[in-house]
């Protein structure tokens, strides 16, 4: 029942619309819009919970209480902060480049929402199952570099510009290890379709076949999405808030929401590419596939939070050296070893 709940609801709705003699195009568009609304609801609710969970986890690591005033155990603190940001005035400084300045917050939030449209959340639960899903993810995430540069440059602030320059250097440096780690998974699965990659892990998860690729991807994605120890783009002790320094009110809230949405996307991609996606471990199929997906996602999120609250921020030169002098060569070596291993495997099978 739980396994087919959402899929059954979608099929039932499609059957009902067709019985009402709706044009097939109208039916498809309506169901796609419904899927987008569902993705947005999932995104907002998880982002609200993630902010609270991150604060509570950090408090536990540092032996303090964390949010504890608004609601039982502070569970409504994130809601209160959201209302506060909604109520704040959106102040636009005089010397900003107005249109790029206003467009950047909208685009920075749109990018992760677009990524959610190709994620296989469960068996048969993919809003849009692209044949080139991996390529789509790489292409869309690359746009974030341009958006952060827009925000920093248009703000006409030295701290914002410095943060934007750091973001470009950081994201370009760690883009190659991310792509190469994803390529090793594509080689194993023989497909760029995310649902095919999940299906290829039905017997063995790729974390066991690609342990080096997993570590590379885990580290590089953390750097791509600017989480500690790679949070140099908005290092509070150095450049205030980086590209977000001149933003206030709802504009700042969009940047903040995009940060946690990207955080969620990183955990989702680790789950999809290396932890079997919605596949159940130990044959425990009595738990719905979408619930397994969420459990794995939050396990990876907890690992990322652990690194955030236990590691120190590194310097920009250390971060770039680590990407170009260590991660990239190891990523290339992993690709060659994967290719050679697949060649030997096929030779033995012959």
From Swiss-Prot:
UniProt GO MF annotations: NADH dehydrogenase activity; oxidoreductase activity, acting on NAD(P)H, quinone or similar compound as acceptor; quinone binding
Principal EC category: translocase
Keywords, alphabetical: Cell membrane, Membrane, NAD, Quinone, Translocase, Transmembrane, Transmembrane helix, Ubiquinone
Entry EC number(s): 7.1.1.-
Transmembrane segment boundaries: 31-51, 102-122, 132-152, 171-191, 205-225, 263-283, 286-306, 322-342
PROSITE patterns: COMPLEX1_ND1_2
Swiss-Prot/TrEMBL catalytic activity: a quinone + NADH + 5 H(+)(in) = a quinol + NAD(+) + 4 H(+)(out)
Membrane topology summary: Multi-pass membrane protein
Subunit and partners: NDH-1 is composed of 14 different subunits. Subunits NuoA, H, J, K, L, M, N constitute the membrane sector of the complex.
Record-given protein name: NADH-quinone oxidoreductase subunit H
Native species: Carboxydothermus hydrogenoformans (strain ATCC BAA-161 / DSM 6008 / Z-2901)
């Amino acid at each position: 029942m739980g396994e087919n709940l959402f899929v059954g609801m979608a099929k039932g709705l499609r059957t009902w619309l067709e019985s009402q003699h709706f044009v097939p195009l109208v039916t498809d568009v309506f169901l796609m819009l419904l899927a987008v609304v569902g993705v947005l609801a999932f995104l907002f609710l998880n982002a609200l919970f993630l902010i609270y969970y991150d604060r509570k986890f950090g408090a536990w690591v540092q032996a303090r209480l964390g949010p504890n005033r608004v609601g039982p155990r502070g569970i409504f603190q994130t809601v209160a902060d959201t209302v506060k940001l909604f109520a704040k005035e959106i102040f636009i400084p005089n010397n900003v480049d107005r249109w790029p300045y206003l467009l950047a917050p909208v685009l920075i939030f749109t990018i992760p929402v677009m990524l959610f449209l190709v994620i296989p959340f469960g068996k048969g639960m993919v809003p849009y199952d692209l044949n080139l899903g991996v390529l789509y993810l790489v292409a869309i995430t690359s746009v974030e570099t341009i958006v952060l540069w827009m925000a920093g440059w248009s703000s006409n602030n030295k701290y914002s510009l410095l943060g934007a320059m750091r973001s470009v250097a950081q994201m370009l440096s760690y883009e190659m290890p991310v792509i190469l780690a994803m390529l090793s998974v594509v080689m194993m699965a023989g497909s760029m379709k995310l649902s095919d990659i999940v299906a290829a892990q039905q017997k063995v998860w790729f974390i066991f076949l690609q342990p080096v690729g997993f570590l590379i991807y885990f580290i590089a994605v953390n750097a791509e999405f600017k989480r500690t120890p790679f949070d140099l783009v908005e290092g509070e002790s150095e450049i205030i808030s980086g590209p977000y320094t001149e933003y206030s009110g709802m504009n700042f809230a969009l940047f903040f929401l995009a940060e946690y949405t990207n955080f969620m996307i990183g955990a989702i991609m680790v789950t999809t590419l290396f932890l079997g996606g919605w596949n159940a471990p130990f044959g425990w199929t009595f738990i719905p596939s979408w619930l397994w997906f969420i459990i794995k996602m939050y396990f990876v999120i907890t690992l990322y939070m652990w690194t955030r609250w236990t590691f120190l921020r590194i310097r920009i030169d250390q971060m770039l050296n680590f990407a170009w002098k260590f991660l990239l060569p190891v990523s290339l070596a992993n690709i060659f070893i994967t290719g050679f291993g697949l060649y030997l495997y096929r030779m033995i099978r012959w």
